[in-house]
Structure formats: structure tokens, C-alpha cells
């Protein structure tokens, strides 16, 4: 078998190869064995029609399409490997000439392939520098957030105020009927958190323990339960307890409780400042790299096939599904709660997906032009660093990465990172 690959455009080409006659004959035999299983012919048991009788009744040509499918399936991988290219998607299959038993079959197969980016300027690009200075207000805000995290709830005498926590029973009624999912006992709610529908929490302000009240609200038009959307409702509320936050004092003891490595509040503040600075530097580095990749991509010329964009959208939907799944929600539930659909999400993701594909192709072109190489040793070193970062044994991490391509995928990521490093080394702040 002699296979030849010829590109016809930036993202498409034709593979031509000839499958030998004996391979086609075997495929015809295999097709007969498959087809005859389902044949019901009077005078013969199901699946037992002799081959000569089949040929007489239907003609051997009736097997050729199935045989062609079998032959293609059995030969295409070898032809692709011999021609030395990597297809992304199948576009079309043609056969030159007439199919005939005892003769070779000449395939002409059109594939979509990854296009090559035509690079523009990618060195000497300018980026907007981001300040990494940490202000005193930012340190104070972080300190107060830690203080709030250490707060404890204590029972409070008197009326509910915004920010207090209420423990109460409620039962919801619409059109005079109690509705499903609108009842709870000893429910805990922070007033002002916005967890309940608009107007509910505000009407609880001023209530005291033991008080009962009818809370009148209207469900939003876009509420996920269609039978309640836009309807007025009454919630019968009985308040059991009012709790308020008691925050710890900002002193040396508080500092030691938060961070065992410090002894005083001033040391904690210094530690917070150092952490915030490190975070800002990392964020600034990421922003700079993103800006440079965006510019290099904008300067390049790329013909991105639709199939690549759709594949990237598939990845993005999968990534999003994994994120919401970690919060205990599957995608179908998410679509129901938000009133959206997968089709709408995919359409919204398309533009970003295309930009991601373009950026990847540009970085690949830069890596090729700059002759960037990533060795197995580089990948192993990166694996070691990742195992330390995520506190996972290297072998376990290797197993987890295997379905995504393992070390080869890791090497590809490293190559892209090195390509961005070249943009950074040759870039400059405005």
C-alpha cells in the first residue's frame, strides 16, 4: 500500500492510497457473513442462505458498500501513519473507479488537519504593567475578613438587625395553597445575605424571638419553578432565636490563633502583606503573559476550521461541568436552575473557544520557529513539581494524567509555556 498526503488548503488535504485486491475480497467475505445473519429467505433458516444463492438473488455488488466500510476501517490507520500526518476530522471519502472483486480499491479521503499559523510580529510587543503595591487598606480589609471568619454566633436579645442570623420556621402559600419546597423548621438564615427571594429578609428585620408574622412577597418572573414564577406568595414565619456575630479582638492572641508562625499582631500584618504582594505579583505576571499572547495572536493570520472550535467548546463545557459538579450540581440541574440550555452555553462559548484555538496555534508556530524542545526529563521534573504542589504521589499523578495523554500532553504544555517565555523575554512595559 502506497499512501500519499497532499494539502489543499491551510486546514484541509487529501489522502490517496490503494488497498490491495485481496484485502477487498476479504472485506466482501466479511460483509456477507454480517449481512446474511439477518436475512429471512423462504426455504432457508435465518442466516443460513448459501453464498451462491445470495449472489444469484441479490448480486454480489449488494455487499460492496458494506465491504467498502470494512476495508476503510481496516486500512485507514495504516495509510495515515504511512503518509505521516495527523488528521483532526474526516471530511469526505471517495473511491476512484468502479468497485470490482479481484481488483484493488483506490481511496481518496479528505481530512481536516490542524492549520499552521502565519506569524506576524511576536517580539518587541508592549504590555500594560499592573501595579503590585499592597496598600494599608488592603491589609486591613484582609485582617477584618480573618476576624469575621473567626466570629462566633451568640443568642441576642431584642430585634433582628441586618447581618443578624435568624432561626425560624416558615410555610409558603400561593393562591391559598401550601406549595412544595416552601416549608422548613428551625431554618438558619443570615439577614441581608440575599439567599431568599427579594423582600423576604427585609420584612424580618425588627422581629423578636417568639414573634409570628406573615411575610408577603412576589416570586421573580424568571424563578426556576414555573408554577410560582411571577406569583404573589405569603410565608407564615415563626421566629425562634436571633443570633449575632461576636468577632474576636484584634490582638496578639488573635494573631497567634490565625497563624502559628507569628507571635504578634504586627507580625501577622507583615505576613498578610507578604502574601498579598506574592499574589499580586503572580496575577501581574499572568496578566502580562495574557496580553502578550493576545497581541501575538492578533498579529498572526490563521484559518481556523469550525471543527477545531467545536472541539474546544466541548472541552470548555466539560470543564464547566466539572466545576459545577464539585459543588454538587450536575449540568442538567444547572440549566434548570438558571433557565438556560447547553445550546445557548455553547453558542456563548464559541468566540472564546476560537480565541483559545488561535492562541494555541500561534504558540505552536512560535515554538516551531524558535526550535523549542521539551525532553522527557523536563516533563518528569514538571511532574515532580506538580506532585509537590497538589500533595499527590508522582505515580498517582501520572495515572491521573494518562487519560489526557500523560507526559506527552505535559510536554506540549511546557512547550507552550516556553513559547510564552520568549514573548516575555522580548516584550516591554508601556
From Swiss-Prot:
Enzymatic reactions: [protein]-peptidylproline (omega=180) = [protein]-peptidylproline (omega=0)
One of the record's GO cellular component terms: cytoplasm
UniProt domain PPIase FKBP-type: residue ranges: 163-248
EC number of the protein: 5.2.1.8
Subcellular location: Cytoplasm
Alphabetically ordered keywords of this record: Cell cycle, Cell division, Chaperone, Cytoplasm, Isomerase, Rotamase
Top-rank taxon, per record: Bacteria
Single GO MF descriptor: ribosome binding
Top EC group: isomerase
One BP term from GO: protein transport
Domain notes: Consists of 3 domains; the N-terminus binds the ribosome, the middle domain has PPIase activity, while the C-terminus has intrinsic chaperone activity on its own.
Family label: Belongs to the FKBP-type PPIase family. Tig subfamily.
Function statement: Involved in protein export. Acts as a chaperone by maintaining the newly synthesized protein in an open conformation. Functions as a peptidyl-prolyl cis-trans isomerase.
Protein name, per record: Trigger factor
